[in-house]
Amino acid sequence: PAVSLYNLREGNRDMNMGKSNQILIWEELGDSKSLALTYNNTSLYTWGFLDLEKDGPTVIEVPPGVLGALNDMYFRYMEDIGAAGPDKGKGGKYLVLPPGYEGDVPDGYFVVRSQTYGVWNFMRGYVKKGAKEATQRIKGKLKVYPLAKKDNPPETLFTNMSGLAAYKTIPPNDFSFYESLDKLIQEEPIEFLDPVTRGQIAAIGIVKGKPFSPDDRMRKILTDAVAIGNAYARANTVFPRDP
């Protein structure tokens, strides 16, 4: 899950849309040109990634008429937003706090605490009145900014992704899988993983604060392992042959 979400964020960064206030939106709905997890062509998607290490506590002004969620960088559910969230589809202000935050928490927000600095801010817009109306509603109401700049927030920027073929977020199935995982481990507080998982990744050489540099023997083992794991998942989960 961590590598999957890491590569989703890398897809945003490859589009020069990696800042908290930079939001991707599919104004003409999704299409097969964008390669993203569980993606379809009937939803008006919009998403971005928070950077709580850089920005500190961050406000998301959620528009009415959306359905979404916040996930941390281990793909753990944090909170529903929109119709299934505490704003009940009417829109509202969410305040996302970074790991270990002990400062003041102002009133007037739906408060969400994160175990990671990175947070996926994801929602679908209802298109009962058409994609154009949903796009205008979202772009007019969705705002993301640091709490420290609430009195003069920076503009929230949108990029229309419909029809663009450059957006690729699929996790790798070669050795770079482990390099992605190591990069995420180095930039997040290690407490976001439980001790058992920390031990498992340490056994293959991924340790917080240390370089990931397997020798040729271990590199071959890991390269084979990720290819076999990918094939196993495809054969047994993605497209099983059981009736």
Predicted feature descriptions by range:
Residues P1-P243:
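A compositional/structural signature for long, glycine/proline-rich flexible linkers
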